[in-house]
Amino acid sequence: PQDTAIVVNPNDPASPRGSDYLYDISVVSEVKLSISHDDWNTFLTNFDLNPDNNTYIPATFSFKKGSESFQIDSVGVRLRGNTSRRRPEGATGELHQSQNANWHHVHFQVKFDEYRDKVKFCNSDRVVLKWFKDDAMYCREVYSYDLFRRFGVWTAPRASYTRVSIDIKGDSKPAYFGVYALVEGVSEAFLANRKAAGKLTSKNGNLWKASWGATLSPNSMSDDKMGVSVTSLNPSESVNYVYDLKTNKKTGLNAARTQLNDFVNTMNGLASGSSALKTFLETRMDVDQFLRAYAVNVMVGMWDDYWHGQNNYYFYFDENNKFYFIPFDYDNTLGTSIGMNAGTQNMLTWGSLDNDRVLMRKVMSITEYKERYKNYIKELASADNDYFYTDKSLARIQQWHTMISPYLANDTGAEMMLNAVPAGWGNISVYCVLRGKVTG
């Protein structure tokens, strides 16, 4: 059928659809980023100056789902990732080649309001386009975020499948980058959507991104570890913090630091297992969301997390000082691990329970919480529920494979087929999605 361009309002052409439409896991949408020749060359040159830079370039964002199509001009596009970052085309110093370009899979972030205020798409202010690095089964991150949602973890981002094309204006045709994960960005709009759904009471609190070393322990709370990260084109001008404040950045840093210190130090000072600690946790954090999130976390074998890896999560304090844990970055799961055996690790001692992980140590010291966590693991594993149980999980993954398989071949020449092998750097090679041994 002929495409139907739908425009509802200039700030969000798909606002009536909402996030359920954008992160619909039952279909493969299409995303095209149209970028001028000069801006793409700037993108490549910026990478050469500093591969870690977060500098945006302008683009036109096009989204197609079924017979509906949408377009937003003047969005911002940048690279994402840590160890996964690389040049999207060619080698160092090379500019764009209109013929026989050497394309590379990369992660992109699209920010709809980078150049124009209040612009959104399906109520989101940004989306992350992630290639399936080290996941030849094209399922790990999508599966994990879907499982969070099924199990009621509304603090987790959402994800779906999409087909990504990069259209360098003037080229004979767009470059097809293949199937990507379309992941919800954790941002102000992320908070606003959850407030609108009645999950949060406020959207204007302090949102933090936690990176390696973020133990949520007093010894990680110094001011030189809490700040607003800046990643510029000049590496010497860049500064990164373990705890990176993402909201209220202009005037609220000192208050946010005080709030975080107060939460950690007060919790740390209360006796483990005590009624005073339980009262504090009940009033100052969403304990149930945390327990549900961690039951899913260990079931999918996420080792590069808060508990084991002191890494890869967000957290949010609402305007009533209540703490919410936000799981994040679940591509290294389902058997892809290092530093632990994710298939046999004790789920009650997934990571440290000493002074290096005060939050986990304190929560697990409350018998009621530990038992609830254990019961959640049982719920996830039960054959009666459509959660983690083997047959139920495999059916979902196989359905997704049927859906995406026709679209895997792409112009990078890489990751062109499904292959049941874990990441080459992983420590347990027998853990393979859809096949493999039970233990490593």
State each model region's role.
Residues 20-22, 26-28, 39, 99, ...:
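Middle-to-C-terminal accessory/interaction subdomains
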